[in-house]
């Protein structure tokens, strides 16, 4: 997004190739897509798991707001006599937060859940082709896992971005074999990062 807006972008890559672990991962992408997931049925077991999630003690203001939002969504779903698989970004956030034993930052978890469908759409606009249905991969909590039809692994995400950078001549520079070891803050905002090269040398990249 920043590069498309004309900003110069520097990407620190810990490994010697772009993408790191994502490139060798299975390629599944979890994102709430109610319309696509509606091809599946809402089993009694899945409904029970949602009801149990919504009965959890409220742990924060945002937690309570998300629970209330999903309750309202479910009420609308029930009013329509819904038998198809229910989902929403709020349910995705609640399930993800609980799966992490509530240790994560719920604000960030919610941003991740909201951003997943947006990035899915952006990837499609860049030429990434998604399968016409979702599934529930091993370890997932809900059948909202998406796969590509034109790639077999996570390398597809990286190749799509690299191709976009190349074809549109975006101002993106990669620094390989370098870990971003610290974030530099100024007035409560990220102002740069500290990079640690493979030989142990450290340097700063300022925004």
Regions found by a protein language model. Name each.
Residues 10-12, 180, 204-207:
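Short hydrophobic core segments
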Residues 20-22, 42, 141-143:
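Short Asp/Glu-rich motifs
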Residues 14-17, 29, 34, 179:
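Short, ordered loop/turn segments at secondary-structure junctions
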Residues 4-25:
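Glycine-rich FAD pyrophosphate-binding loop
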Residues 87-203:
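Conserved redox-cofactor binding core of oxidoreductases
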Residues 24-59, 79-82:
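N-terminal glycine-rich dinucleotide-binding loop that anchors FAD/FMN and/or NAD(P) in oxidoreductases
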Residues 34, 57-67, 72-82, 99-100, ...:
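Aromatic-residue-lined binding/catalytic grooves and analogous aromatic/hydrophobic interfacial grooves
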């Amino acid at each position: 997004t920043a590069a498309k807006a004309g900003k110069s972008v520097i990407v620190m890559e810990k490994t010697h190739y772009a993408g790191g672990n994502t490139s060798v991962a299975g390629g599944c992408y979890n994102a709430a897509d109610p319309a696509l997931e509606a091809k599946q049925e809402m089993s009694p077991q899945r409904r029970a798991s949602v009801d149990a999630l919504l009965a959890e003690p409220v742990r924060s203001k945002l937690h309570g707001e998300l629970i209330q939002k999903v309750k309202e969504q479910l009420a609308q779903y029930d009013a329509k006599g819904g038998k198809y698989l229910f989902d929403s970004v709020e349910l995705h956030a609640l399930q993800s937060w609980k799966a992490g034993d509530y240790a994560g930052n719920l604000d960030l978890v919610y941003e991740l859940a909201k951003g997943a469908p947006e990035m899915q759409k952006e990837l499609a606009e860049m030429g990434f082709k998604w399968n016409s249905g979702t599934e529930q991969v091993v370890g997932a909590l809900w059948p909202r896992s998406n796969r590509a039809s034109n790639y077999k692994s996570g390398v597809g995400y990286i190749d799509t971005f690299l191709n976009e950078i190349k074809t549109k001549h975006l101002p993106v520079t990669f620094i390989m074999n370098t870990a971003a070891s610290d974030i530099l803050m100024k007035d409560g905002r990220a102002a740069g990062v500290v990079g640690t090269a493979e030989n142990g040398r450290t340097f700063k990249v300022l925004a």
